[in-house]
Curated annotation (Swiss-Prot):
Record keywords, A-Z: Ribonucleoprotein, Ribosomal protein, RNA-binding, rRNA-binding
Subunit (UniProt): Part of the 50S ribosomal subunit.
Family classification: Belongs to the universal ribosomal protein uL24 family.
Cited Pfam families: KOW, ribosomal_L24
Entry protein name: Large ribosomal subunit protein uL24
Originating organism: Azotobacter vinelandii (strain DJ / ATCC BAA-1303)
Amino acid sequence: MQKIRRDDEIIVIAGKDKGKRGKVLKVLADDRLVVSGVNLIKRHSKPNPMLGVQGGIVEKEAPLHVSNVAIFNAETSKADRVGFKIEDGKKIRIFKSTQKPVDA
């Protein structure tokens, strides 16, 4: 079970976007995440009239390493760590500071 999953609210704790918050769009296999509005890069794209694609400078999210983010606890309004607990025979994720489930 992964500590950070798709649609989790996270906060960046290291790097150029430190302090920014966003929602996880995609979790990649090599411990990297794509987060909405964080780690934006600019890419130049050629126009393709056959596909109807207009050229120009496109801004998109680049992946960042999972060690540079922490899950955001809305109750405490701070970054938090994730732990696991077995409840009713199921393994659930909990916030370490409040011991409450993440997926509540």
